[in-house]
Amino acid sequence: MGIVVKSFKDQFSSDERLKESNNIIAKYPDRIPVIIEKYSNADLPDMEKNKYLVPRDMTVGHFIHMLSKRMQLDPSKALFVFVHNTLPQTASRMDSLYNTFKEEDGFLYMCYSTEKTFG
């Protein structure tokens, strides 16, 4: 039987998540709190950690590159990230995504996959 990985939202209440994101932003104002989780059907390994403090001026492309290296993906394997079921432009800055898509708990939620389409 496979290990069931609970999502970040299932592990912590909305109040706990809001308190944590507020603490992170107060302590690291130049960074944004990002939760990245594997799309359920993705043929990829789970990451050891799913919570990242990302520089506000980092591009989505740089973030994807960092995730690929962290997962030690074969360079021939493409990695895609989604925000609210949308594939963001790789040139987009993370702070722009955060300002547009952050959730009420103060985190930006993303998922990753090897497929370019969601669903």
From Swiss-Prot:
It is found in: Cytoplasmic vesicle, Autophagosome membrane; Vacuole membrane; Cytoplasm, Cytoskeleton. One of its GO terms (biological process) is protein transport. Induction: Induced by sugar starvation. One of its GO terms (cellular component) is cytoplasmic vesicle. It comes from the Eukaryota. Gly-119 forms then a thioester bond with the 'Cys-558' of ATG7 (E1-like activating enzyme) before being transferred to the 'Cys-258' of ATG3 (the specific E2 conjugating enzyme), in order to be finally amidated with phosphatidylethanolamine. This lipid modification anchors ATG8 to autophagosomes. A lipid is attached at residue 119 (Phosphatidylethanolamine amidated glycine). SUPFAM superfamilies: Ubiquitin-like. Constitutively expressed. InterPro entries: Atg8-like, Ubiquitin-like_domsf. It is a lipid-anchor. Pfam families: ATG8 (PF02991). Keywords: Autophagy, Cytoplasm, Cytoplasmic vesicle, Cytoskeleton, Lipoprotein, Membrane, Microtubule, Protein transport, Transport, Ubl conjugation pathway, Vacuole. PANTHER family: MICROTUBULE-ASSOCIATED PROTEINS 1A/1B LIGHT CHAIN 3-RELATED (PTHR10969). Interacts with ATG4. Interacts with ATI1. Ubiquitin-like modifier involved in autophagosomes formation. May mediate the delivery of the autophagosomes to the vacuole via the microtubule cytoskeleton. Belongs to the ATG8 family. This is Autophagy-related protein 8h.
